[in-house]
Amino acid sequence: MSEIEKRNHGDCNILYKEIKKREQKLVNMKKEGFSFPNSFKKNTTSRKIYQKYQTKNRNELISLNIEVSIAGRMVQRRIMGKASFFTLQDIEGKIQIYINEKKISSDFYRFHFKKWDIGDILGVIGTLFKTKTGELSIYCKNVTILNKSLKPLPDKFHGLSNQEIRYRKRYLDLISNNKLYSIFKNRSNIITAIRNFMIENDFLEVETPMLQNIPGGANARPFITYHNEIDSQMYLRIAPELYLKKLIIGGFERIFELNRNFRNEGVSARHNPEFTMMEAYIAYSNYEDMMELTENLFKSITKFLFQDNKIIFNNNNFDFSQPFRRLTMTDSILEFNSTITSSDLKDFYKIREFAKSIGIKVEKKWGCGQIETEIFEKTVEKKLIQPTFITQYPVEVSPLARRNDINLNITDRFELFIGGYEIGNGFSELNDVEDQKTRFLNQIQKSNKEDNKNLFYDKEYIEALKYGLPPTSGLGIGIDRLIMILTNQISIRDVILFPTLRPFKK
């Protein structure tokens, strides 16, 4: 056995003994009448205490005689004979508690409190005071154990160093990393800000099916399930788009949905199979109207969250009060690729050779539009740091977008990029039923065998289009990526409480 194996074996043995010791303590507690208290009436949090009383001096706190009731997890303890200091951690921070046997009785202190462990959940009632070093603390009058931690917490100095364990055991990550709470609090605030903005702009929030007969609205591999009662294969939705446009056909004019989508595809720092998206549609408008709305939405979110429009993400400064840059896909490729010309992008043989020269595997059924999009994704996308709308996407890669009036080979479509990430996608919606029918069929015909399994001809949507879809613009925003940028996190797993992981294997 190597030294590392010996050390690991020794660590496991120590952990096993510690767990058994704690389990026996719980057995003893139950014999003494512990029955898992049903509640504890707390009246404050650690953060509120600091916010309100940190500026008070020792004498002021004595004269005020402020009694507080607080609950949380004991994460540190320093026993000094007949008195102890311990740290209580709640969701908003930590606060120091002072306890001595004179205040709570000698027997309780010696035979109960001193036998409790780090990680135990406690309820504390006491008065505020400041120590000689000026630390705001609570002088404990009464302390109750609310639940026993049967396993020791991660090392307080190193926390959880294994990334996968952090994601798999998020509860431990939250206990050992106080900063994590602020990320997910901001996530909630961002979603609130989006909803507030949409409602203030006269949008109605709607809900469309998660279980669908045909997974439409995007080209992605779906999750497949089965409905026993109706004896039918069904799919978790990959996008709500086609249902939302049916509502526009039905007479709704300004709608949005903020919910989950599911795509049975890769997991990475940028992708999670289960993700949150906001889609919005405005009748009697075009993609330029939607770009303007998108800019205003981002201004509103950052102002709500930070009281300012300036943020930092991945060491880059952003100012969302400034107009977003607008660039066509063709112009963006020319800007970042000095060896190709505008005429080359229109010549099938030249654009194909250029794509091959930069490592793109060109498929036989691809036209210029698909190849141009692949070049853009490989050479441009990650270089778009400041907020940029890329417009004029080829028809070939935009089956649901309206053709441009001047150039029928491109669409009135945009994608928003920030920090090298695609954050949003929007366009003037295609409402020509014959064109839509043809594009659906062409998409299936040109796809490879693997993609073909994921493409469906949606007869119900074509039927709905026959009743007339008014001029409409649509928008989709990836909420998880947006939250990454606004909270300065470089992995999507750090903004999802329980990201998708492979099954644990011992």
From Swiss-Prot:
UniProt keywords, alphabetically: Aminoacyl-tRNA synthetase, ATP-binding, Cytoplasm, Ligase, Magnesium, Metal-binding, Nucleotide-binding, Protein biosynthesis
Q: Name one GO biological process term.
A: lysyl-tRNA aminoacylation
Q: Does the keyword Nucleotide-binding apply?
A: yes
- Write out the catalysed reaction: tRNA(Lys) + L-lysine + ATP = L-lysyl-tRNA(Lys) + AMP + diphosphate
| Cofactor requirement | Mg(2+)
Cofactor: bound how, per the entry note? Binds 3 Mg(2+) ions per subunit.
Q: Which GO terms describe its molecular function?
A: ATP binding; lysine-tRNA ligase activity; magnesium ion binding; tRNA binding
Gene Ontology annotations for the cellular component aspect, listed alphabetically? cytosol
What binding partners and quaternary form does the record give?
Homodimer.
Q: What is this protein called?
A: Lysine--tRNA ligase
Organism field? Buchnera aphidicola subsp. Acyrthosiphon pisum (strain APS)
Which gene underlies this protein? Answer: lysS
